[in-house]
Amino acid sequence: FVEIIRTSRYYLFALSYFVLRRLTKEEISSILKILFCIVIFQSILFTIQGFTGIALLIGAESHKSAKLITRFYNSPLMLYFFVFYGIFNNPFTGKYKYISALICIVCVYMPLHRSLTISFILILILGLFLKMGKIKQFINYLPMLLLCVIPLVAVMGAQLASRTMNDINSVTTGEFVDIEEIELGEESTLLFRIAHFYERYMHILEKPIETAFGSGLMAEESNYTNKKFDFIVGLENEKTGEIVQLETSDIAWSNLIIRYGIIGTLIYLTIYISIMIFYYKHRKVRYALSTFLYLLLLLFTSITSNQLYYVYMLVFPLMFFDMTLEKNNPNLTNNENEE
């Protein structure tokens, strides 16, 4: 029971809605501006550590060099939201508006993450099309778009032709099914993730109750977990040398399927997509477009990141929910401080 409480503490963030809904528009704006400044500072540090190879932020143990840039994966936790906030709802004006947005955009690219880079560009282009009502408005965002498209071309040209296509070929030929025969290395990241999900999916199919609702919220490294699971696909625990059985930062779907099962995962996705649709329908309201794009980015990168799984990533959508419902209030339109 204690282990379940420890594992489920993240779900308490869902209760933050009842606190956040009491905030006024001015209080929300002030909080967001402060958090935006914090993320900008974190993004600067993250970019510096990429070029210097010196860890400046916590959680920087795992990294590898990629010629000019050292790849770190400890990017700011709130970056995914505030990169869109900086583009579409930036509280600054003049050159500071563009500099602050550019800092966050550069931070998105620094991990040299293929799926994140491509997903971000595609979603940003979608956001610009949803945002603009006229060609003149699109031209205002054109410099920002060009800054994003140029790295995309480089990433697609240099990496999609090699590693990505090899990964896709391995997955489409079904190599992940023969889990014990998989040889994972630098060139098989997508194959690793699919195999990781597949092994856990096959496990829950062994019992009807787990097929429907998953194996539960047991903690990693607990006695129960060590007895119940014996997965062979996963990262190695540096302390014990054993394979990490439940937790993974590589793919959200493994966490979802092993914890919630098929029905539980479908319920979670139904709620998540309903929130996305809500913000899409109200995208003219301030912060709604940024929130929709943020949720879409979490969904797009769910095969290479675990952030979709964590309830605390929904704090911003919960914060804006009530004020978005007041869409007829002219003070809440997307036009203020965004031109």
Language model features with spans:
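Hydrophobic transmembrane helix bundles of membrane-integrated enzymes that assemble
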Residues: 1-178, 241-331
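Juxtamembrane membrane-water interface segments immediately following transmembrane helices
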Residues: 155-205, 218-220
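Short, intrinsically disordered terminal tails adjacent to the first/last structured region
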Residues: 329-339
